[in-house]
């Protein structure tokens, strides 16, 4: 059976062997609700008898950083000269309790992606690029890869519910520890690695049968609530002599409550992963119908930290859909201390390369469709464990491309900060932006472009009260 039929890919063969669905009928013949994608989805489920699985992220359009724009300096404020005035990017994470906080040369990190979801070459390339950039990279479900540790100057070690590949010795080898309680692509569920990627090496590292789907548990065996999480964090601190910062990573769901509980448990850093976050494999239904967007989650998280009076003391890293320097700048302006990238780094490395178009088509996909990652047949050699495919990925070239991309992303971030008159990217603030949509204005509390009115619920309530008071006074 072809890969698309096995995995439930878009363009699954029908009973005649033809791929896909007939041409879309005219709008008057078929209501918009029952469009091509919906029909194809139903046909696929009817063929497979189960939900569909894909890699990548949601395809839905949600409120995002693109709905905000910067308003740079002109006459009322002075911008900085890019060629002679510095704009600082140095970022410190985890100084709340750790003796050795993480010091980044720029407010960007590489998100957790496992050896298993990615090839050994891809993981090593990420570590090499991060070292040159002066930023951190992160392990993933399945433990620490020796080559990744050697390549990475700053490595964050994830502690996950599965305990796959977990080694107490690796805690001391890491530069920071990240307790993962969820991710934006599939909050409320555990990790998923399809059997096609469970090679002999992966099976040995995770103590699993070769070629069998691996479904990670969703709840940590060591704690069942925030009080237990506090005990776990203290155990991790003791195991590392109180040197390593402890992060808590969560999917963007009940953000305010979760943030407050994580802070109470002693987290030094919160990593908040929004709906747009990608993954190696997930049920499609979770990608499209769970979690809240990154921008919305960030605003709620900042508000929660402000209520606890720990904004700035507990650092906030956001991920999910960060694709360029403008997204990073807007996240920092809204209150984040740093951003984390995953899909952007893999794309820079060479994922979805058009030169492999024929192979994508044979699998029922198009180049640029990162939902192929779960199949284990990624022709670029990035999201695969097939030796002949991995051999296509040149280690040095992959690392160089990630280095170039993040360097360019940093220049974009600095350019926007200078245009707003800021000598440090962390000085960006909401006042430097305007909202381009009503939704974005309501979510962020930033005035709609062309107005000075903040379309937030509190502001609307105050405005209504003012009008009512004015009406009463006029009547009197």
Predicted region positions:
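Mobile "lid/hinge" segments at catalytic clefts and subdomain interfaces of large enzymes
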Residues: 178-180, 186-208, 374-387, 413
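A structural motif
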Residues: 134-135, 174, 267, 336, ...
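Hydrophobic, small-residue-rich alpha-helical packing segments that form membrane-like cores
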Residues: 165, 187-189, 194-215, 219, ...
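Hydrophobic faces of well-ordered beta-strands that scaffold small-molecule active sites
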Residues: 108-111, 135-139, 155-159, 175-179, ...
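Flexible, glycine/charged-enriched surface loops at secondary-structure junctions
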Residues: 140-142, 242-249, 311, 420-430
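Gly/Ser/Thr/Ala-enriched C-terminal appendages of enzymes
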Residues: 323-328, 332-454, 459-472
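Conserved, well-structured core domains of diverse proteins
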Residues: 1-108, 112, 117-131, 135-136, ...
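Glycine-rich phosphate/ribose-binding loops and adjacent secondary-structure elements
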Residues: 217-390
């Amino acid at each position: 059976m072809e890969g698309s039929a096995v995995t439930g890919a878009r363009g699954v063969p029908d009973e005649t062997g033809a791929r896909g669905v007939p041409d879309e009928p005219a709008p008057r013949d078929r209501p918009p609700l029952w469009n091509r994608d919906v029909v194809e989805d139903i046909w696929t489920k009817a063929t497979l008898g189960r939900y569909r699985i894909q890699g990548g992220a949601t395809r839905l359009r949600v409120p995002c950083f693109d709905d905000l724009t910067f308003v740079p300096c002109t006459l009322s404020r002075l911008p900085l000269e890019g060629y002679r005035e510095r704009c600082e990017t140095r970022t410190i994470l985890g100084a709340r309790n750790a003796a050795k906080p993480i010091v980044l040369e720029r407010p960007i990190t590489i998100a957790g992606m496992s050896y298993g979801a990615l090839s050994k070459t891809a993981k090593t390339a990420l570590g090499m690029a991060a070292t040159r950039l002066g930023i951190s990279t992160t392990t993933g479900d399945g433990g620490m890869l020796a080559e990744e540790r050697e390549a990475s100057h700053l490595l964050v070690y994830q502690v996950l519910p599965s305990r796959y590949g977990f080694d107490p010795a690796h805690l001391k080898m890491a530069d920071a520890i990240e307790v993962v309680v969820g991710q934006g692509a599939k909050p409320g569920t555990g990790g998923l690695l399809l059997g096609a990627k469970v090679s002999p090496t992966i099976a040995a590292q995770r103590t699993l049968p070769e070629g069998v789907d691996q479904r990670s548990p969703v709840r940590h065996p060591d704690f069942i609530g925030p009080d237990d999480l506090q005990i776990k964090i203290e155990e991790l601190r003791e195991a590392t002599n109180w040197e390593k910062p402890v992060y808590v990573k969560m999917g963007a769901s009940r953000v305010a409550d979760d943030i407050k509980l994580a802070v109470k448990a002693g987290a030094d850093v919160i990593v908040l992963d929004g709906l747009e976050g990608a993954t190696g494999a997930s049920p499609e239904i979770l990608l499209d119908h769970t979690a809240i967007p990154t921008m919305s989650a960030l605003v709620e998280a900042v508000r929660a930290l402000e209520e606890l009076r720990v904004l700035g003391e507990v650092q906030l890293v956001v991920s999910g859909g960060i694709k360029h320097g403008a997204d990073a700048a807007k996240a920092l302006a809204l209150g984040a201390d740093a951003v984390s990238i995953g899909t952007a780094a893999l794309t820079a490395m060479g994922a979805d390369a058009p030169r492999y178009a024929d192979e994508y088509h044979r699998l029922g996909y198009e180049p640029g469709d990162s939902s192929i990652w779960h199949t284990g047949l990624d022709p670029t050699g990035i999201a695969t464990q097939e030796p002949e495919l991995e051999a296509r990925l040149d280690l040095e070239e992959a690392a160089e491309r990630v280095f170039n991309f993040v360097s360019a992303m940093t220049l974009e971030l600095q350019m926007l900060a200078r245009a707003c008159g800021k000598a440090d990217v962390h000085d960006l603030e909401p006042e430097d932006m305007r909202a381009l949509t009503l939704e974005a204005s309501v979510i962020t509390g930033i005035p709609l472009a062309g107005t000075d009115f903040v379309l937030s619920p509190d502001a609307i309530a105050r405005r209504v009260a003012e009008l009512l008071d004015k009406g009463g006074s006029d009547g009197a």
